[in-house]
Amino acid sequence: LNIISADGTENKVSDKRAANTEDENSSSENSKEAYDAAIYGDADINLSGNGKLTVEGGYEDGIHSKSNLSVESGNYSVTASHHGLNGKTTLVVKNGTFDVTTVEDALHSKGDVTVENGEININAGDDAVHADNTLNVKDGTINVAASNEGLEGITVNIEGGDITVNSSDDGVNAAGDTEDGSQASYAINISGGNLKVVPGGDGIDSNGDLNISGGNIFIDGPSDGGNAPVDYD
């Protein structure tokens, strides 16, 4: 599924269904709903163009691909009662401008999330950017005004970019469960970029390794005295 927002246009896709309040979201095998997002696809979804696309995910997600979700360019405003942009296998942001407001995660994948460039502004009720596997930030600007945890994955790689995270819990977190329940090798690797974290919990928290070889890091907190600016095993 290729969605191109033509230059100079303003487009809107809205899911008017009431928010799903059940514990299991509608993409589960037992769900009676065929789809759970304003824009939904069983196959890959590719977004591009220089126009504006507003997406309102009233029921659950704003945009959800059961395969790979990729954004090449464009201007996006996404609100959702669950996740904002959800690529089950992978989520890749190559470029674009985003304003994402969600009850759950703003950017989410059961696989890998990669941010190559772009400007992403996030207000999230849960994680700002969450990968069940690996989260890569290569460049771009990520501004997280509010989140539970900011950047989370089993492995978090920050190679560049300008990142500001406000979180009620951990700012950058290497944690989570593997799909088969086995013990994961957690790691946070920071080799470049500018990272500012204003956390309620730990600023940087790895349940495994922490490797810092470059970049600029500023941690203002935590506000909760039971936590630490940096915590790793």
Map each language-model feature to its residues.
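A composition-driven surface/loop motif
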Residues: 1-233
